[in-house]
Amino acid sequence: MRCVPVFIILLLLSPSAPSVDAHPKTKDDVPLASFHDDAKRTLQRLWIKALCCYGYRFCCPIFGKGK
């Protein structure tokens, strides 16, 4: 009888069938993967600019012609 409550709790914690999104997608909805890709690209550009400007000011977009 001790196993019954544990079994019921495990059943409640187990993943259920995938839910269906109740809201229809609109043109304003952006997939999360796309958002993460954009954020990753932006961070990579900023990182490259930071490395470039740190040692070589001539390649920095603020001080020179580089991007």
From Swiss-Prot:
InterPro entries linked to this entry:
T-conotoxin
Which one of the record's GO molecular function terms can you name?
toxin activity
Signal sequence interval, chain numbering: 1-22
The Phenylalanine amide modification is found at 63
Q: Name one GO cellular component term.
A: extracellular region
In which tissues does this protein get expressed?
A: Expressed by the venom duct.
UniProt key word Disulfide bond: yes
> Which cellular compartments is it found in?
Secreted
Q: How is it modified after translation?
A: Contains 2 disulfide bonds that can be either 'C1-C3, C2-C4' or 'C1-C4, C2-C3', since these disulfide connectivities have been observed for conotoxins with cysteine framework V (for examples, see AC P0DQQ7 and AC P81755).
Instruction: Indicate the residues removed as propeptide on maturation.
Output: 23-48, 65-67
- Provide this UniProt record's keywords sorted from A to Z: Amidation, Cleavage on pair of basic residues, Disulfide bond, Secreted, Signal, Toxin
* Family assignment from sequence similarity: Belongs to the conotoxin T superfamily.
What the entry says about domains is: The cysteine framework is V (CC-CC).
* Name of this chain's protein: Conotoxin LiC33
